[in-house]
Amino acid sequence: MLDILKNNWSDAQIVDVSYQKGTLLLALKDYQNTIHKYLFENVIALSFENYLNEDISEIHSSFWKEENDTICQIDILSAWTNKEIVSFSFFTH
């Protein structure tokens, strides 16, 4: 299981999304104001809306096979609108 999926992220916020050359750095701040940073490599798709200071309701994941590769998609939902504020897909190892 991915580390990001092990926590309950309700009342957390996205504080940074940085993308460069197929690598995504995602920083989340939990309700105790602790910053958690996650690095994802081999990112093949990324979309986001205005996410700063937006509370998270939950994080969804899905996995599927494409030829010989496994792909994971992560969707982060807004607590206010329940819509995706960040979504990305990447090849897993």
Which residues does each PLM region occupy?
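Surface-exposed, interaction-prone regions used to assemble/regulate multi-protein complexes
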Residues: 1-93
